[in-house]
Amino acid sequence: ILFLAVFSFGSFFLIKNKCLFVKDIDPKKIKFDKPKNIAVLNVLCGNVIIELYPKISPTGVKRFITLVKSKAYDNVAFHRVIKDALVQAGDLEFGKKGNIDYGKIGTGKSGLGTINSEIDNPFNFEKGSVALARTQKYNTEDSQFFIVLRDEPLYETEYTPIGKVVYGLEALEKIKYLDKSQYVLRPDYINTIRMLIN
């Protein structure tokens, strides 16, 4: 029992220490120009505020919002993480907490089918940009998405952009990663994603 108590305290300390310099953002205290386009991604170290861009990628944003409103992303792993480059999540089939399939994670589907790539509108993939992931083929976007942690100009016209992080990017920079692999064992998870206005 004593060992368990020490372990629990140690785990709590590590989590608190990991998030020590991350400012937690309260979206209710921020005035947004277009609050209907704001999604709040909650992770271990706090809130990440995403502004969605339906005029740039209407189909992609619609799919994302549909999944957010159904709470499909809750407790889904950040299964692919490249330090200082990107975090990827959204495998609804093989990435759910308590039911992860490490052999298949990253290949799962939402059950809604794929959608077409939206890559014709100009978009600068600056740090914090949010986009839908796909296979090596275009028009295979579904539920998985990624957020870049640095500027990625070569992603323009390659991936469907759906928005950009406007607050809280620091919380994503604390997501667990592995030095020798892009795919993470015992990963961090999305707690919830909610639209600011339902």
PLM-predicted stretches and their roles:
Residues 1-198:
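Cyclophilin-like peptidyl-prolyl cis-trans isomerases
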